Amino acid sequence: MKLSPPHRRRASAALVLCAGLLLAVPPVMALTPLPAPQGAQQGEGYRLPSAALQAVVDAPRTPSLYLSPKGDLTAVLQIPALPSIAQVAAPELKLAGLRIHPKTVSDSRFSFGSKLWLASNIDGKERQITGLPQPLSVAALTWSPDQKYLAFNQLDPATGANELWLVDVQAGSARRVAERLNSIVGTGYAWLPGGDALLVMQRPAGQGAPPQADGVPTGPAVQQTEVGQGVRSVRTYQDMLKNEDDARLFEYYMQAQPVRVSINGDSTPVGTAGIYLGLSASPDGKYLLSQRVQRPFSYAVPVNRFPRNIEVLDAQGKLVHTVARLPLVDGLPTGNDAVPTGVRSISWRADAPASLVWAEAQDGGDPSREAKVRDAVLLQPAPFDKPPVTLAQLGSRYAGVTWANGELALLDEYWWKSREVKQWKIAPDHLDQAATLLVQRSEDDRYSDPGEPVLHTDDAGRSRLQLSADGNSFYRIGEGASAEGDRPFLDRVELSSGKSERVFQSQAPYYEMPLSISEGEGGRILTYRESNDVPANLVARSLAADAQPVELTHFAHPLPALRGVKKEQIRYKRADGVELTADLLLPPGYDAKKDGPRPVLMWAYPAEFKSAADASQVSGSKYRFNAISYWGPQAFLAKGYVVLNDPTMPIVGEGDTEPNDTYVQQLVASAQAAVDEVVKRGVGDRERIAVGGHSFGAFMTANLLAHTRLFKAGIARSGAYNRTLTPFGFQAEERNYWQAQDVYQKMSPFNYADRIKDPILFIHGVDDNNSGTFPIQSERMFAAVKGLGGTSRLVMLPNESHGYRARESIMTMLAESEDWLDQWLGAEAGKKR
């Protein structure tokens, strides 16, 4: 399993040690104003920032780690430098919400690894792998359930190759076992139970060339509402089908033929080709759960809303049972708790040979209806000749099950409106046995979070609840939020009483996150550990008394000569008493008393809360690695700026009050408190503070410049500024525009463009497909500021989506931001701009 920093995660051994890049600089770097950038010119070309910022972009990246099912091995995948704009600009198709690479028949925006090796989790020794394809381009990697093999996609956009390769772990050698994969949706392959074969999605043999449009329309594109359908919210999706030519292309590229591929490369077709959104084997390997898309398609919603047939097939692909035929979902009732009617979230029960589990709304999927039971959770075992039985009836929405055995499972439910989370202990083989409530809390209350259940991989390759050796307890891993900051932990939870015993907790001066636990030989846990100047490394810990931790990896600081950034987690209050938190980062060698206040870059992202107490909680840890990547604000420490990173900007609405009813007032109050705090500490020059953000942070930036004069400049990347263009909700806003016109209007900085008196830089990807942040949002906002006499600059990055990928784009983003900050903040305090 891949290792990545945990965020609401369920599996313990699923963490990628991806350390960011820290950039330190000499103690003082003079900031001098640059000539004002000229108006946008055609053919300006891509740009380079200063050498210090280039170093951030080109610094080596920490490898990704994939723990084996038994936890004694790690597959290490080196991530290469950023792709070039030539790679990012390769032709792609935008169909039904998907972005397709037509040559490889894959997701066009995949990332890949360029070097692969194995490492022991006992002593850290590394093993090389022979026979790997060159150049290596690993798009997805998974362990076999028995840990004998590693499978991975090898993609080559130049040739169009999309291949499946296996690594024999014992032999340390690799070989190709399948070609012509279709990995537009998912990885294109999955291990079958037992680990002796894989289920592979291949392009159909003899498919021929893709259909070509002749440029002559066959007729208009028509959409029509249904009589009596009522209010149906439809988000502002992008990359939708536009006409029948698009529909035929979509059908062509999405066609996949399931094939059983054994580890020796023998292959057997399974069933028929189709447009599969899912195909998964039952734990006993005797059945397949199939989800196939059917016409009619839609011009308004993406593929996951298209009509689909949910069926059970046998191992050869023959139909055994039809579970449901789901219609097109072209809209939902208003509210974030709204769901489609019918079968939802269907999967195999992980601890049973072949049993299906799914949820069905009992309130018509409409959260505005009064209903004691919102969702029913249903269970249907093979041979599927009897009606499903009810596993649970829930007062909110089904959020999944963690399976252990017939005596134990943990069932989750969630209600967005109240943020309430519940977790129940159930006995799935004893439906007459009452459920026990284990957890009931607000999702926003991080201090009360008991952690997520620890999972293990069973012999069928299924993730199941890990029990203690005596079967009387299970484990939880959590972030350990507290008034002292995050201190990750591992708890053992007694099943009979529900009492927790702390097995491990992170201690200063480290931030240490548990990954897995094994009970043999006194007990052993794997963690990843980091500190301010050392990136995250994999560590083994014996639970025996006085045992010393053993570092299994030794990832060094990516820029060892550039250390010394000082980080402090600061606390302060805004005017209404809500407590706020931020990371204050100071340039290397900087001394406030000796050097005086500096220019400040503040970078933030607002969040909605239903409780002022929850909004006031501390988040983050002062012991985390001072990671600086090109994506965040910290790189500008290289220019001598003070950085206030992630100052909390809570938007609170308690009880029946919606948070956004007072969005602007609360946003301004939080910003005022942050500015006052850095000035009070003597590190920030009040006359030289800039604010910036990405996406909803860009929206925040434009609002702060429209409603305050706290900031001398702003950087707004990939934002939305006119909320009438997202009329069916955005972020946590559930109401549609016609229910809350005044809120939508007041929150839209576009309506106050005439009040933006300080310079604002807009950056946006031309191909942004994020729901709500259409590129036209930045184009129209820039035009408004420009037309009203404001100071602004618009940078549209070709071929980039909501996040930017090409090296040239990232360099240009930094160069533009650097010039903007130097120009408007670089002048001495008080000097006229």
Labelled PLM ranges:
Residues 110-113, 121, 620-833:
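Active-site-proximal cap/loop segments of hydrolase catalytic domains
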Residues 598, 605-610, 621:
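Active-site glycine-rich loops that stabilize anionic/oxyanionic intermediates
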Residues 2-16:
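Bacterial N-terminal signal peptides that target proteins for export
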Residues 553-596:
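N-terminal cap/lid segment of alpha/beta-hydrolase-fold proteins
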Residues 310, 356, 438, 538, ...:
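Conserved hydrophobic/aromatic pocket- or pore-lining residues that grip, position, or stack substrates
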